[in-house]
């Protein structure tokens, strides 16, 4: 599924770059329906990009991904939810992932100012909304989760 989704994205991206209306998004939505992988045709993705077990992968429109990047199921490269999100139209809203990065299952990396450096490994179930320097590893430690009362529930 990952190969198919990437192949369809590459075709859609070229059409997107040539300002072809609607068709690029239709192509990526067909790929999404067949694979469970949602890559916006506006995303910029380098060479040697690999998606393994891709169900639930979401890559937003202004995401930039470098070369030799590998991601696993459930990864979201998305925008932060903001009250004034409409003000960010035509601006960088999604993260930048540099070269030689591995992002494991169910990690969420959010925000246009978020940059993941070269040679970084992002562990599973990690939620990131700030930049990570080159040559780092980010992991979720179960001792650090919090349980809070729900408001109104």
What is the role of each PLM region?
Residues 67-153:
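Glycine-rich hexapeptide-repeat left-handed beta-helix
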Residues 46, 54, 64-66, 133:
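A generic structural motif
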Residues 1-29, 151-153:
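Terminal amphipathic alpha-helical/low-complexity segments used for targeting or macromolecular assembly
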Residues 17-47:
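Short, conserved active-site entrance elements at the starts or edges of catalytic domains
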Residues 58, 62-64, 68-70:
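Alpha-helical transmembrane segments of helical membrane proteins, especially in multi-pass transport
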Residues 51-53, 59:
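Glycine-rich phosphate-binding loop
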Residues 55-56, 108:
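Short beta-turn/strand-loop junction motif enriched in small, turn-promoting residues
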């Amino acid at each position: 599924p990952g190969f198919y989704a990437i192949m369809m994205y590459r075709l859609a991206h070229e059409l997107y770059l040539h300002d072809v209306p609607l068709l690029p998004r239709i192509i990526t939505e067909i790929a999404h329906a067949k694979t469970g992988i949602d890559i916006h045709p506006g995303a910029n993705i380098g060479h040697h990009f690999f998606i393994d077990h891709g169900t639930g992968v979401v890559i937003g429109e202004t995401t930039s991904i470098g070369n030799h990047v590998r991601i696993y199921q459930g990864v979201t490269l998305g925008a932060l939810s903001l009250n004034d999100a409409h003000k960010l139209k035509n601006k960088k809203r999604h993260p930048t992932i540099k070269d030689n990065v591995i992002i494991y299952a169910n990690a969420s990396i959010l925000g246009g100012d978020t940059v993941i450096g070269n040679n970084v490994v992002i562990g599973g179930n990690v939620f990131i909304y700030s930049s990570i320097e080159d040559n780092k590893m980010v992991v979720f430690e179960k001792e650090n989760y919090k349980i809070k009362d729900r408001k109104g529930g």
